[in-house]
Amino acid sequence: TYGDMNMHLGFITSIAKQKTFPPEYSILPGTKLAYPFLSDSISSSVYIWGTSLRTAYLLPMFFALIQVFSGVYLLAKKIMQYFGGSIRGKSFLAIALFFFNGGLGFYYFMNKGLFSENFTRIFTAFYETPTNYVQANIQWHNIFCDMLIPKRATLFGWAMLFPILI
Protein backbone atom coordinates (compact mmCIF):
# COMPACT_ATOMS: atom_id res chain seq x y z
CA THR A 1 0.00 0.00 0.00
CA TYR A 2 2.83 2.39 0.76
CA GLY A 3 5.15 1.26 -2.04
CA ASP A 4 5.13 4.54 -3.92
CA MET A 5 6.40 6.69 -1.04
CA ASN A 6 9.96 6.49 -2.38
CA MET A 7 8.72 7.72 -5.75
CA HIS A 8 7.00 10.70 -4.12
CA LEU A 9 10.09 11.55 -2.06
CA GLY A 10 12.10 11.51 -5.28
CA PHE A 11 9.56 13.77 -6.99
CA ILE A 12 9.62 16.20 -4.05
CA THR A 13 13.40 16.60 -4.03
CA SER A 14 13.54 16.69 -7.83
CA ILE A 15 10.88 19.42 -8.14
CA ALA A 16 12.62 21.42 -5.39
CA LYS A 17 15.94 21.30 -7.26
CA GLN A 18 14.56 21.85 -10.78
CA LYS A 19 12.59 25.02 -10.01
CA THR A 20 10.80 24.70 -13.37
CA PHE A 21 7.15 24.32 -14.24
CA PRO A 22 5.88 21.91 -15.39
CA PRO A 23 8.42 19.65 -13.71
CA GLU A 24 10.46 17.05 -15.54
CA TYR A 25 10.68 13.39 -14.67
CA SER A 26 14.01 13.10 -12.83
CA ILE A 27 14.80 9.57 -14.07
CA LEU A 28 14.17 10.52 -17.72
CA PRO A 29 15.61 14.05 -18.17
CA GLY A 30 13.77 16.08 -20.77
CA THR A 31 10.51 14.18 -20.22
CA LYS A 32 7.65 16.11 -18.64
CA LEU A 33 6.26 14.58 -15.46
CA ALA A 34 2.97 12.92 -16.42
CA TYR A 35 2.07 11.82 -12.88
CA PRO A 36 -0.37 14.09 -10.95
CA PHE A 37 2.16 16.35 -9.23
CA LEU A 38 -0.03 18.75 -7.21
CA SER A 39 0.78 17.11 -3.88
CA ASP A 40 4.46 16.76 -4.68
CA SER A 41 4.79 20.39 -5.83
CA ILE A 42 3.19 21.57 -2.57
CA SER A 43 5.55 19.32 -0.60
CA SER A 44 8.55 20.56 -2.57
CA SER A 45 7.61 24.15 -1.66
CA VAL A 46 7.53 23.17 2.01
CA TYR A 47 10.88 21.40 1.52
CA ILE A 48 12.40 24.54 -0.02
CA TRP A 49 11.32 26.50 3.10
CA GLY A 50 13.87 24.45 5.04
CA THR A 51 11.83 21.68 6.63
CA SER A 52 12.95 18.09 6.71
CA LEU A 53 11.87 15.81 3.89
CA ARG A 54 9.61 13.90 6.30
CA THR A 55 7.84 17.09 7.39
CA ALA A 56 7.54 18.26 3.79
CA TYR A 57 5.90 14.93 2.91
CA LEU A 58 3.49 14.74 5.87
CA LEU A 59 2.45 18.36 6.54
CA PRO A 60 0.54 18.98 3.28
CA MET A 61 -1.16 15.58 3.66
CA PHE A 62 -2.32 16.56 7.16
CA PHE A 63 -3.92 19.78 5.92
CA ALA A 64 -5.44 18.01 2.92
CA LEU A 65 -6.99 15.40 5.25
CA ILE A 66 -8.51 18.17 7.36
CA GLN A 67 -9.88 19.78 4.21
CA VAL A 68 -11.38 16.48 2.98
CA PHE A 69 -13.01 15.72 6.36
CA SER A 70 -14.38 19.27 6.56
CA GLY A 71 -15.60 19.10 2.98
CA VAL A 72 -17.44 15.82 3.53
CA TYR A 73 -18.99 17.22 6.71
CA LEU A 74 -20.14 20.43 5.02
CA LEU A 75 -21.47 18.54 1.99
CA ALA A 76 -23.38 16.14 4.26
CA LYS A 77 -24.69 19.11 6.24
CA LYS A 78 -25.91 20.80 3.06
CA ILE A 79 -27.62 17.60 1.89
CA MET A 80 -29.21 17.09 5.32
CA GLN A 81 -30.50 20.67 5.31
CA TYR A 82 -32.22 19.91 2.05
CA PHE A 83 -33.99 16.90 3.57
CA GLY A 84 -34.58 18.56 6.95
CA GLY A 85 -34.23 17.13 10.43
CA SER A 86 -31.34 17.04 12.88
CA ILE A 87 -28.46 18.29 10.78
CA ARG A 88 -25.47 17.94 13.09
CA GLY A 89 -25.98 14.31 14.17
CA LYS A 90 -26.71 13.12 10.65
CA SER A 91 -23.65 14.90 9.29
CA PHE A 92 -21.36 13.19 11.80
CA LEU A 93 -23.02 9.87 10.99
CA ALA A 94 -22.34 10.50 7.30
CA ILE A 95 -18.65 11.09 8.06
CA ALA A 96 -18.44 7.88 10.10
CA LEU A 97 -20.18 5.79 7.45
CA PHE A 98 -18.14 7.29 4.61
CA PHE A 99 -14.62 7.21 6.03
CA PHE A 100 -14.74 4.28 8.42
CA ASN A 101 -16.68 2.01 6.14
CA GLY A 102 -16.22 -1.72 6.20
CA GLY A 103 -17.94 -5.04 6.22
CA LEU A 104 -18.95 -7.63 8.75
CA GLY A 105 -15.51 -9.24 8.81
CA PHE A 106 -15.10 -8.30 12.46
CA TYR A 107 -17.14 -11.43 13.23
CA TYR A 108 -14.11 -13.60 12.41
CA PHE A 109 -12.02 -11.76 14.97
CA MET A 110 -14.54 -11.29 17.77
CA ASN A 111 -16.22 -14.69 17.78
CA LYS A 112 -14.12 -15.78 20.80
CA GLY A 113 -14.18 -12.54 22.79
CA LEU A 114 -12.28 -9.27 23.02
CA PHE A 115 -9.14 -10.67 24.67
CA SER A 116 -8.73 -13.78 22.56
CA GLU A 117 -5.76 -14.40 20.28
CA ASN A 118 -8.13 -13.96 17.36
CA PHE A 119 -8.93 -10.35 18.33
CA THR A 120 -5.34 -9.31 19.08
CA ARG A 121 -4.29 -10.43 15.59
CA ILE A 122 -5.95 -7.28 14.27
CA PHE A 123 -3.20 -5.23 15.96
CA THR A 124 -0.23 -7.61 15.67
CA ALA A 125 -0.53 -9.45 12.34
CA PHE A 126 0.69 -7.90 9.11
CA TYR A 127 -2.25 -6.32 7.26
CA GLU A 128 -4.84 -8.60 8.78
CA THR A 129 -7.88 -6.48 9.43
CA PRO A 130 -11.59 -7.24 9.68
CA THR A 131 -12.16 -5.72 6.26
CA ASN A 132 -9.15 -7.29 4.57
CA TYR A 133 -9.13 -10.90 5.76
CA VAL A 134 -7.81 -13.01 2.89
CA GLN A 135 -8.35 -16.37 4.62
CA ALA A 136 -12.12 -15.81 4.52
CA ASN A 137 -11.99 -14.00 1.14
CA ILE A 138 -13.10 -10.70 2.68
CA GLN A 139 -11.61 -7.83 0.68
CA TRP A 140 -13.61 -4.74 1.55
CA HIS A 141 -11.17 -1.86 1.34
CA ASN A 142 -11.47 1.08 3.66
CA ILE A 143 -11.50 4.50 2.00
CA PHE A 144 -9.38 6.10 4.70
CA CYS A 145 -6.68 3.41 5.03
CA ASP A 146 -6.48 2.22 1.43
CA MET A 147 -7.16 5.38 -0.58
CA LEU A 148 -6.55 8.65 1.26
CA ILE A 149 -3.42 7.88 3.28
CA PRO A 150 -1.34 5.89 0.75
CA LYS A 151 -2.55 7.57 -2.45
CA ARG A 152 -1.51 11.19 -2.33
CA ALA A 153 -3.04 12.08 -5.70
CA THR A 154 -6.45 10.84 -4.52
CA LEU A 155 -6.17 12.76 -1.26
CA PHE A 156 -5.35 16.06 -2.95
CA GLY A 157 -7.93 15.43 -5.67
CA TRP A 158 -10.61 14.99 -3.03
CA ALA A 159 -9.32 18.05 -1.18
CA MET A 160 -10.17 20.02 -4.33
CA LEU A 161 -13.38 18.09 -5.11
CA PHE A 162 -15.43 18.77 -1.98
CA PRO A 163 -15.14 22.58 -2.03
CA ILE A 164 -16.31 22.44 -5.65
CA LEU A 165 -19.32 20.27 -4.72
CA ILE A 166 -20.33 22.54 -1.86
Residue ranges of model-derived segments:
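Active-site lumenal/periplasmic loops and adjacent helix-entry segments of GT-C-fold
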Residues: 1-160
